[in-house]
UniProtKB/Swiss-Prot annotation:
Required for the use of extracellular DNA as a nutrient. GO terms for biological process: carbon utilization; DNA catabolic process. This is DNA utilization protein HofM. It comes from the Bacteria. Disruption phenotype: Mutants are unable to use DNA as a sole carbon and energy source. They do not show a growth disadvantage in stationary phase growth in cocultures with wild-type. The lineage of its organism: Bacteria, Pseudomonadati, Pseudomonadota, Gammaproteobacteria, Enterobacterales.
Length: 259
């Protein structure tokens, strides 16, 4: 395993940063390391990095522990993204024209300069449409600058909620939605969609299911007494991570896409 590339998921939360490193064998997934790094107050606020310099200072000792051969999948808060669905245009477009059309359409929808946005899109599996996810360029630039300061290799920046999709194959057949919660929010994902709900006034899985208009029995919750994300890792050696769902997003990022 010493020569394998470490796949690392890094999840920056309001009070802490958590990270998980795995390597892949021919048929198995091996846990290498996990980290839990407390963050001072006001470094991150409502998903936005407020004090990038202090964040870099906190993460620098961690970054120095990483092997040279690594890829980091970095979480981007779903609260800082915008999602829209647009019907496919009637005319056939090449990839470049299609990207330009979606960029302009999204910018007009949000009344923003196209250059101020970065976006990704996929074809809707259930209808003739494109699902577009956008974020402000300056917020992504902040993360890339952080990576440069830490001298780490970032291979992907991914909405945090979408990382939960990686665990859906591990759920019982009657459950199609996985949710994760911290003090401020719920993150949720199904095979075809993902998102975020504020936790205020929504304290149970039943209330979340009602907000999503799904059967409560179809929702699994990450954490003790619910779904254990570590089931997705074939081989775990001590020191073992704490039980519960605190590392779910970071682990999902490290594992990569399920579909």
């Amino acid at each position: 395993m010493a020569f394998k590339i470490w796949q690392i998921g890094l999840h920056l939360q309001q009070q802490e940063a958590v990270a998980v490193a795995i390597v892949r064998g021919a048929k198995e997934c091996f846990l290498q390391r996990w980290w839990r790094l407390p963050l001072e107050n006001d470094i991150i606020k409502d998903g936005r990095i407020v004090d990038a310099q202090q964040l870099a200072k906190t993460l620098l000792p961690w970054s120095r522990e990483l092997p040279q051969r690594h890829h980091i999948m970095l979480a981007f808060p779903a609260s800082r993204t915008l999602q829209r669905s647009f019907p496919r245009p009637s005319m056939s477009l090449g990839e470049r024209e299609q990207t330009a059309w979606l960029s302009g359409t999204m910018a007009r929808e949000l009344d923003m300069d196209p250059d101020s946005l970065r976006f990704d899109y996929s074809e809707d599996s259930l209808s003739p449409a494109y699902n577009v996810t956008a974020a402000q360029s300056k917020e992504l630039a902040t993360l890339l600058t952080l990576a440069e300061r830490l001298r780490v290799h970032v291979s992907a920046i991914t909405p945090d909620a979408s990382a939960l999709q990686r665990f859906l194959p591990f759920l019982p057949s009657h459950q199609q939605c996985l949710a994760w919660r911290d003090n401020e929010q719920w993150l949720w994902a199904t095979r075809y969609s993902w998102g975020r709900k504020l936790a205020v006034g929504m304290t149970s899985a039943k209330e979340l299911a009602a907000a999503l208009s799904v059967d409560p029995e179809s929702v699994a919750i990450c954490g003790e007494g619910g779904f254990d994300p570590w089931e997705a890792v074939s081989v775990r050696q001590p020191p073992l991570p704490p039980p519960g769902g605190d590392f779910a997003i970071a682990l999902g990022l490290a594992l990569g896409k399920a579909y």
